[in-house]
Structure formats: structure tokens, C-alpha cells
Regions:
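Hydrophobic transmembrane alpha-helices and their membrane-interface boundaries in multi-pass
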Residues: 5-82, 89-93, 111-114
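Short helix-perturbing small/polar motifs within transmembrane alpha-helices
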Residues: 92-103, 140-148
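The cytoplasmic-loop to transmembrane-helix boundary for the fourth helix
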Residues: 98-116
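Loop-to-transmembrane alpha-helix initiation sites
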Residues: 127-135
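Juxtamembrane or sensor-core-proximal signal-transducing alpha helices
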Residues: 134-161
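Conserved nucleotide-binding and Mg2+-coordinating catalytic segments in signaling enzymes
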Residues: 158-180
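Active-site-proximal structural segments of metal-dependent nucleotidyl cyclase/transferase enzymes
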Residues: 178-191
Length: 191
């Protein structure tokens, strides 16, 4: 939908605008490996967003951004230690809004949180790890709830926009959509 595309575009724009200065800073301070990671993240995110915008593949684009953002936050956490863990919180929230497939976002987010905790390089001690697990788990649950509620409300509003409130019959909007689909199918079949 157009709303999903706008989320993808805004994510791409703000990711590039915010991560790019960090990449420059990393190179200037001698953290070349992290600077390269940041540069690769910005480049890949920008390319994926342009693809989604050009071809209208918002769901595929959103899923790919979930993977890229999460893995980028994971690698950043591993390379920078506890300072990099803060990027994981951004990834957790973004994951539930970049794709309408909430199950995919849930599974991938959970896997990345557990993987970060298992590797343990990001945390100085067990207390930090358990604190991260508690806060990231809570944030993931709350993000899931908000994304699920948003999806339900969007579906309800779409249903209301498609039906006549008095009769419950489908309205002109549905007819135009069905006519468009019929014309496309007719063109494909060549009849």
C-alpha cells in the first residue's frame, strides 16, 4: 500500500541521513571496519529502498530491510560492544513496521536478539546481557502489539471504505478495482 511504501521510504531516508555521519566519524577516528560497515549499510539500504520505490515491491523490500537492519545492528553491537547495542532497539521497532508480515518480523527479531545474547561479545557481564534481554524483549512485545493493532485498524478502515454503510454492499471503489483486474486478466489471456 502507499502507507507501507512511505514507511519504507522514510526509513531509507532517515537511515542514510543518520548513519552516514557515523560512518564519517568512524573513518576519522580510525575505526575503519565499523566505518565500512556503516557505509555498506547505507548503500544497501538506499539501493533496496530505490528498488522498492521503483517497482512497488514494498513487502519484499520491507522484509529485506528487516534482515539488513537487524544484521547491521547485530554486527555493530559485536564490533562496538555495548555502545553498538543501542542500534538494536531501533532495529526492533523498525522490524514490525517495515513489513506487514508480523510473523516474519517476530521470528527474525527474536532470532537476532537471542543470537546477540548468545555471542556475548557485546556485554561486559551477565547483568548487562539479562538487562538487554528484558528490555529488548519488552520492546519487541510492545512493537508487535502496536503493529498488530495498526494492521487490524487498517483492515477495518479498508472494509469500511469498500462498503456502503446502509446496505453493506460493495461500493464503486470495489467495482473500479474489479474492473481493473478484469481488464488486466483479459489482456493477459488475449481474449
Amino acid at each position: 500500500t502507499d502507507f507501507q511504501l512511505s514507511i519504507v521510504l522514510l526509513y531509507g531516508f532517515f537511515s542514510a541521513a543518520i548513519i552516514t555521519p557515523f560512518a564519517i566519524y568512524r573513518f576519522l577516528t580510525g575505526a575503519t571496519a565499523v566505518g565500512i560497515l556503516d557505509t555498506v549499510l547505507v548503500t544497501v539500504i538506499a539501493c533496496v529502498v530505490v528498488y522498492g520505490w521503483k517497482y512497488g515491491e514494498t513487502e519484499r523490500t520491507g522484509k529485506f530491510l528487516v534482515v539488513i537492519g537487524s544484521l547491521g545492528a547485530l554486527l555493530s553491537s559485536e564490533m562496538l560492544g555495548v555502545i553498538g547495542v543501542f542500534w538494536m532497539y531501533v532495529a526492533i521497532v523498525a522490524n514490525f513496521f517495515l513489513t506487514t508480515n508480523i510473523r516474519f518480523a517476530t521470528v527474525f527479531t527474536t532470532a537476532v536478539i537471542i543470537l546477540l545474547a548468545i555471542t556475548g561479545k557485546s556485554f561486559d557481564n551477565a547483568a548487562l546481557m539479562w538487562s538487554f534481554l528484558a528490555t529488548s524483549g519488552l520492546l519487541a512485545v510492545l512493537s508487535y502489539i502496536v503493529a498488530h493493532q495498526y494492521e487490524r485498524q487498517r483492515a477495518n478502515l479498508e472494509h469500511l471504505a469498500d462498503t456502503d454503510p446502509l446496505t453493506g454492499a460493495f461500493n464503486r471503489r470495489v467495482m473500479e478495482r474489479e474492473l481493473h483486474l478484469a481488464v488486466e486478466e483479459n489482456a493477459r489471456k488475449g481474449t
